[in-house]
């Protein structure tokens, strides 16, 4: 049986970003194919994003090409869900 690769992507924006830009970043993340849920969080990161992809390669492309390419995103950390 085929199983999708699921991950949590922790996203950090620039520390001086305005609330308006944060909302824009969240809206842009929500548009990315494969994004299932987006949460604003407190702490070192600004967003926790649940994503789904067919392969680990597709997951890598989703993060590097799509999420990291959004204006305002300065850093991501990806946690692949194992169980």
Give the predicted meaning of each segment:
Residues 1-83:
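A compositional/biophysical signature of low hydrophobicity enriched in polar/charged and small residues
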């Amino acid at each position: 049986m085929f199983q999708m690769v699921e991950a949590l992507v922790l996203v950090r924006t620039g520390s001086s970003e305005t609330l308006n830009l944060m909302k824009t970043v969240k809206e842009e993340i929500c548009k990315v194919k494969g994004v299932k849920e987006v949460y604003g969080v407190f702490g070192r990161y600004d967003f926790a994003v649940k994503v789904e992809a067919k392969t680990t390669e597709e997951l890598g492309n989703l993060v590097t090409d799509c999420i990291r390419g959004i204006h305002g995103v300065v850093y991501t950390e990806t946690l692949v869900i194992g169980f």
